[in-house]
Design a protein with these regions (language model features):
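Short, structurally constrained coil/turn elements
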Residues: 39-41, 114, 150
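Cysteine-nucleophile active-site neighborhood
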Residues: 74-140
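N-terminal beta1-alpha1 cap of cysteine-dependent amidohydrolase-like domains
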Residues: 1-84, 89, 94-98
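Short loop/helix-cap segments at secondary-structure boundaries that form the rim of catalytic
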Residues: 58-64, 111-113, 166
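Residue-level detector of flexible, active-site-proximal loop/helix-junction positions
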Residues: 13, 52-54, 109, 127, ...
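Pocket-forming structural segment of enzyme catalytic cores
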Residues: 11, 117-166
Length: 166
């Protein structure tokens, strides 16, 4: 495998990440980097947090160098409009224009859907805490190296308050 340039986006605000670190818990972006390095060392990974950056001038000029983007979780909810969320939506719009391969996990999906004009709302069924059962891999997914050793149907830990509406 040739070295790939990946951008990992941190979704939590700096105060949340400080709290994680003070309690010996890795941030979402640190956890993603660690997981990826277990899979391969042929990655150049940069981390960016649009919550704490007042300007995207440092990253936008070189954004096309990334072969992919991974946008992970956060304790934020997209419908709780604040400047940190607005910055993330704005940055995701730039990513959607410039990076072809995007993996949006949980919070990342909320940001991507909103940036693309969709809607996310608090689930009327309450929080989903526990195990997501019977996840089915589609035909595209079955050929991806991440899923090559998985069964076509599997279970995974899940924790969600929100749902994509459109």
């Amino acid at each position: 495998m040739n070295n790939l340039n990946l951008l990992v986006v941190e979704g939590n605000i700096e105060e949340e990440n400080k709290s994680f670190k003070q309690n010996g818990i890795p941030t979402h972006s640190e956890s993603l980097k660690e997981s990826l390095s277990y899979y391969t060392n042929d990655l150049n990974i940069d981390v960016f947090n649009p919550c704490s950056e007042k300007s995207f001038d440092k990253i936008l000029p070189n954004i096309k160098k990334y072969h992919g983007l991974i946008w992970g979780g956060s304790s934020l909810n997209i419908y709780n409009d604040c400047i940190e969320i607005q910055r993330q939506i704005s940055f995701m719009k730039e990513c959607l224009k410039n990076i072809k391969k995007i993996l949006a996990i949980c919070w990342g999906m909320q940001v991507a859907v909103t940036a693309a004009g969709g809607k996310v709302k608090k689930s009327v069924n309450g929080a989903h805490i526990g195990i997501a059962n019977d996840i089915k891999i589609n035909n595209d997914g079955i050929n991806h190296p991440l899923y090559k050793s998985k069964n076509k149907t599997f279970n995974s830990p899940a924790f969600n308050f929100d749902e994509v509406v459109t």
